Amino acid sequence: MAVRSRPQLAFQTEKENGIGITAFNETAKLYANVVEALDAQRLRIFDSVAGSLKTEYILEKEKVISCIAWEQKPLYASEQITTDISGSGEILVLGTNSGEILIYSEHLGSLTRTYSFGILQKIIGAHVLANDGFAIDITGKVVCFSVNTGEVRTSFTVPSSSREFSGLYLSTVFKNLALASSHNIHIVDLNHRNPIDSLTTHTSMINSVVFQYLKDENKFYFGVSANQDRFINLYSKELDGTGEFPTNTVKNVGALVCENEVKMLSIAYEIENPETGVLAALTNDGTIEMFENPWLSKLRQNGTNASSLSHRRKLLTSHSTLKICFCRSRGDPPIVLESIAFESTDSLTVVWKESTRTVFETVPWRILSSQATNGLIELVRSKTRLTSKNKTVSNVYDESNATISSGVMQKDLRKTEEIGSAEAMEGEEQEPSLAERLQNLTKLDQQAQALSTQISASTSLSTVLTQALKTNDQSLLESCFNNNNVETIDTTIRRLDPSLAPILLDKLAEKLALRPMRADVLMVWIRCTLITHGGHLVLVDDLKHKLANLHSILEDRASKYSSMLALQGKLDLVLSQIAFRKAGGSKDNAEDEEPISIYYEGYEESMDEASSTGDEGYSSDDSVDNEMYSDEENSSKGAFPDEENENRELSEDYSGDESLENSESE
């Protein structure tokens, strides 16, 4: 038999009310969710049967998804979507904070259409039924458009006293019938662009709506749940069978009560036998409460009139017939589930997160109902190895979540100074002898050799690093970070548990901020960690906050790179010029140059005597200049014979004086 499953479609982001942006398709075989990455959101689609990731798509940085929904198959005749949009597979509709609507093809693995109408704000509900597309923004503005052409068919605003809306729900049985939700429920005829009925259902924002059509009664039933509310209000609306929707025909037929606040609803029923419907409510604590035949109240079942109003309310209120929860061991709190959806009226698919893994399980709830104890089924599911490690890591990481923006942490400096001063005072009070100092030095050398031998092995280094990260042992971390062997660092990081990568990066950021001069070694650790465990890091929740310290430090260092590079260029230029001069780069030119002046001892006195003899027109400066020429040049100019004789006598006197000095020295 064909089964219609109506899984809940999420409309709020996780930051708003704790509900993630998730959606099951109608068969509950495909599951989509949106996760936060470093700088952009990621759309991930899973095969819930195999429990594996099927496709992943990285959205543009400026696009922030606010709601998602799978394509629904209407029961009425309609035009189909072209294959260039759907890729002969199912499509996913995504609404953004900027008012855009994106169409993602699961078969093609890419965005095939983007619609921007310019009149919508933040999209809180978007649906596609064949070629008919529908969207509503947070202010209640509704747009109906053609998926194939993108043409707007109609647009209007739902009148409401509420400032914000929470979703839009389309009927697959009746064309142009929709329910818009805020604090109230507005039944809207999309063809006439006006609300048929408006109901005040809850005091808080509605988070889930499910509905079912009973052909025998010609009634349209729907159930409504809201945030911070344990009650699920049930309503019915009579139809006239002419294709029109009469007004003022909505009645309250009862309420379903859960033990905790309702997170989402899901309903399944057989088309050929719609009275065998079953409704599942997921509560905030992770418990699933099952309601069989939810529209059949005790008052209708007994067929009697209540004697009082309180008795009537009691008959209209129903509690769950079965509760299902997943736990680590008997009696433990339930595991918080992310979403649920009916695969059939007898089986339910649930999904929850374990660290970065998404876990799926199909629960044959009708078969397990015979094993219930006091109406409760506890399914024990132990943690995986990765999850158990993540739990320990999370505790260690939370103990050292100090934010480092830049510079040196003054707190650590004060601690270091206090320790140093305390040790100094203690040393002054009790100073060891020379023999004790020698013994201590010998022990320290032996310990250093043993530690270096241990650290040199990559396996031992990986073990030491894991232990240091789990116990937050600073001395062990320091011994690991002192290793600057690239091969050892790379092998150690490869053998490190991926769940410890965020903690390692945080510790490296602290070391880098405290000791910037160790950047050469620490950057090798950071680079190897990002390369080896980058695939795991992008799947870590709230990664931006966890790596904020590292990002701030690296950004601060990168901002100084251009100025330091310019300074390095100037220093290289100056140093190269100095080296060139020291190496005697101008020796060749120096050999060719003539001396500026030549000085002869006793020459000036003889020139004074010559000038006093009355040689007019010839100065001592001219004699010095003429002396700098060779004998050939002087003869060509008609040199003075008296001066030549005087020069010859001076040279003889000079040589005689020199020989006299040599003899005296001997």
Swiss-Prot record:
Pfam families named among the record's database cross-references? Utp12 (PF04003)
Task: Please report the residue spans annotated as repeat (WD).
Answer: 14-56, 60-114, 201-246, 259-301, 316-362, 495-535, 570-609
What residue ranges are annotated as transmembrane? none
- Asked if the record carries the keyword Nucleus, the reply is yes
Q: Where in the cell is it found?
A: Nucleus, Nucleolus
> Looking at the keywords, is NAD present?
no
Please list the GO terms describing molecular function. snoRNA binding
User: GO CC: one term?
Assistant: t-UTP complex
Q: What PANTHER family does its record include?
A: WD REPEAT-CONTAINING PROTEIN 43
How does this chain assemble? Component of the ribosomal small subunit (SSU) processome.
User: Can you tell me which family this protein belongs to?
Assistant: Belongs to the UTP5 family.
Q: What protein name applies here?
A: U3 small nucleolar RNA-associated protein 5
Species of the source: Schizosaccharomyces pombe (strain 972 / ATCC 24843)
